[in-house]
């Protein structure tokens, strides 16, 4: 009997915490595609998976994972899909996989902006929850320099819409993104921005620049200077000290971009995490951490 495989176009990315979710292709590539540091979808033109593609994959998923409880839609930002298309996706998922409880995906702040609070509430009822937002920073200068396409005010306004709709969300924080000498500003402003909101997870990555990015070209021209590994650690330390969540937030710094991985819950484990960071500063040399980053070939 021939093994049937679900079809995906190009590279597939998902957060570490979605490891147990069923992956389903909803979009291909990125609708924004202008962030200076990113080349994940460089050679992939953005498009929406057709209904036929989605149903073909769901038929296969039904064979091998009929009791799946969570689906993670792949693509850089499937939440860019219209309200109606997201409704259709959720309906199809329920038809083929009736035990699915919730649906996650990557999202841009601009994707949320397109939807009304009433539409978001209906999407929550259909199962959309714990969407992962590539905020990267809560500092306006950094967001602008990296062509993120939105401001701190946009982050706060749109995430409050999610909260009012009952949709939980996760953030990405990319340390080192502000460049050399700017880590303190980025840490303080990002902590202050995130403190206004209620993310479930903050997924911490450390900037890793690859040759096929605009940022790599700027480094070559001298218009962007990378933060040292120690400055990045200090940025993370300042963020943790300043961040004041009103709910339990899971801090995950355990991707390949983090030379010394750690995880913890804030505010409960703040002191333990800070002690771990101090231990990293005491026991690892800048050159060793830098050598590790140079060996990273992909994320």
Identify the meaning behind each predicted range.
Residues 1-18, 195-299:
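Auxiliary Fe-S-binding modules of radical SAM enzymes
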Residues 30, 38, 54, 73, ...:
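Conserved, mostly hydrophobic/aromatic
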Residues 110, 138-142, 162-186, 205-211, ...:
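Conserved strand-turn element in the central/C-terminal portion of the radical SAM core barrel
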Residues 54, 86, 116, 155, ...:
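Aromatic/hydrophobic pocket-lining residues that form the small-molecule binding cavity
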Residues 68-74, 132, 169-174, 202-207, ...:
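Short beta-strand segments at enzyme active-site cores
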Residues 118-120, 179-196:
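Catalytic cores of alpha/beta
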Residues 10-53:
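Canonical Radical SAM [4Fe-4S] cluster-binding loop centered on the CxxxCxxC motif
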